[in-house]
Amino acid sequence: GKSKENMLLLKHLKGDVQGKELVIEDSIVNERWRQVLKENTDIENDLFNYQKNREISKVPFMPVDRLITNDEVDDILDTLTKVLPTGKFTSGSYLEQFEKVLSTYLHKRYVIATSSGTDAIMIGLLALGLNRGDEVIMPANSFSATENAVLALGGVPIYVDINPQTFCIDPNKIEEAITPYTKFILPVHLYGKHSEMKQIRQIANRFKLKVIEDACQGIGLTDLGKHADITTLSFNPYKNFGVCGKAGAIATDNEELAKTCIQFSYHGFEVNVKNKKVINFGFNSKMDNLQAAIGLERMKYLSLNNFKRLFLADRYITQLAELQNKGLIELPELSEDHVWHLFPIKVRTEDRTDIMTKLHEDFGVQTDVYYPILSHMQKTPLVQDKYSKLQLVHTEKAHSQVLHLPLYPSFTLEEQDRVVEGLFHVIKQEVRV
């Protein structure tokens, strides 16, 4: 159910791979996928119930009421009837079970479930030894939580340019940003695309830096965490896998790091010793037992939902290829190191606002620029003092062109057809083709 396996499965179901027997691993993340594959092989008809000529008038970008299915709601309600009478809402066996299941799925020795992805990054940085004034190399096009975790601890974000094709930090730009104060590299797997972690790890080793990866949009990536000291995740309901609230996790193979993360996540207390502090301070950042119980139910849908995202991305890329071939848009590459949290395209900067407006007004299609302001272009006193002269050429150009199309597991193919139809009409109109 990881990204590489899902790509192979997609090719198999499309008939592009012959003579290979595929086995779906018997694990909790594959539970719903295994049930579907027993009955269905036609993706469009059986997985999406495609009705080609069904009329669509409105296409929402990411409607919160459709990020959880009726089946998931039923499963969650069933498990809540077991948890609520116990009164164990904060600590309990579901939390321990959730961490074990996630550890197995990620192939990491230790997982510490937290109350958010932001807390996971903060705790990870502290466990790795961040001190006030330490520099942390990162991209500038992520959600503010990435930089806020660094700033809250007294660290100094050092923004580095991206690879404009992937939207992820460009490893070739990292070395020139390293100073005697640099202690960390913090890559972000933006939109679900895996950063170039092997090269980043090599740079970190050469300069004796720690690597903590923001994988809040990257659950399901093959080899996630392989080249990082600590991996951080978010289970916000908008993510590929979410609970019914806010939560996150830290993953590592290092026992001492895991122990320190546990201490920072719960008031600095010694592990399994009541109220005995062994570090100066800690946070109230443990994931709730109640959310863990919900997470165990929703985890059953993870592989199925990530496969749906992959299929929808593949379908967008295929159907919009004509616009790309004519140089009217730029599409992301379909690859096995992507879990398609978001689907970004690039359009001409001067046309973007008109395209978004006309898609909405003429076709009922909502699009978005998911992170509208880059980190080094915020108007805060800190940014104006420290980063006002910073120029990140590729980051800024890509940001001025990016446009996000609707994509989520409950997104229908009829809705996708409407998006494609609208894009062809509006973009050709904009450039007078």
Where does each model-flagged region fall?
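Conserved PLP-binding active-site segment in aminotransferase class I/II-type PLP enzymes
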Residues: 5-123, 127, 131, 400, ...
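PLP-dependent aminotransferase-like
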Residues: 43, 126-215
